[in-house]
Amino acid sequence: MLRASLILAVAALAVAGAASARTTAFPITIQAANGDVVISKQPTRIVSLSPTTTEDLFAVGAGKQVVAVDEDSDYPKSAPRTKLSGLSPNAEAIAQFRPDLVVLSYPGPVIAQLEKLGITVLEEPAVDTIAQAYQEIRELGAATGHGAGAAKVVRGMEVKLTKLIRSVPKKHRHLRVYHELTPDYYTATSATFIGRVYKLFGFRNVADAADATHSGYPQLSGEYLLSANPQLVVLADSVCCGQSAKTVQARAGWQQLDAVKRHRVVAVDDSVASRWGPRLVDFVAAVAAAARRV
């Protein structure tokens, strides 16, 4: 019942997306995290200081308007990557690119500093839900003159995610899942964005009962994991830390885990697993493929 309701919620967002399909007319006001942001005309020199917003901008069709992205924006490869920091942005360094729009994910004094220089700033923070991720894509589409492109991206994600979720057999909808962030067992609970993605499938997160501080990102012990016996293991530390199904099998006691015995250990690209843009579909596809294994 829960999974069916969640699938319907994902599909229902298509109705909201239809309103964004029109070509953006300027000036336009975007209700962003930093308030109502007025964009007087279509931006032609955009600086993106967030890997996710960079992916969103290129996906909606605004790639040619982007003149610089931060050092962590590694996708798409055609993005103009620089040494700009998205975590500790410097207004003077950003201003050197003569932007008419700066998009970032973290609040801070740099917003006021850039606005003082006459530069429009749009804050699109980390999201908690897929609905919020869709909304950010729509906002970036509207802000850049690509409302129709954004609507197409969102609709494509909705359709693909619904299909992938439904591809997992009913008998696997309650699998116990462990999402690994680091080899020393830092993980994410159902209270996080990625945890809510697992809930779309109906999976049970083994970390939920161990998050005493309610941080959303507890560190588990090896003993706890062996006792929890996850049936699906997702390794989001494959790039940073070289983790794979092979390295997991070499861990003491892990050969007895259901996930290992059933070959339901999947290594995913760290960056794909940590972002909330269009490549979320790739992450869900990898998880669904592993969950379908008998």
Protein language model features and the residues they cover:
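A short, structured surface patch at a secondary-structure boundary
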Residues: 45-107, 119, 203-206
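Structured C-terminal subdomain patch of bacterial secreted/periplasmic proteins
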Residues: 109, 132-142, 151, 228, ...
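Short helix-initiation/N-cap motifs at beta->coil->alpha
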Residues: 32-34, 82-92, 107, 211-222
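Bacterial Sec-exported substrate-binding components of ABC uptake systems
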Residues: 2-4, 9, 15-52, 148-179, ...
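Extracytoplasmic ligand-binding site segments that recognize negatively charged/polar headgroups
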Residues: 124-139, 143, 172-197, 241-243
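His/Asp/Glu-enriched short active-site or ligand-binding loop at hydrolase and phosphoryl-transfer sites
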Residues: 191-217, 267
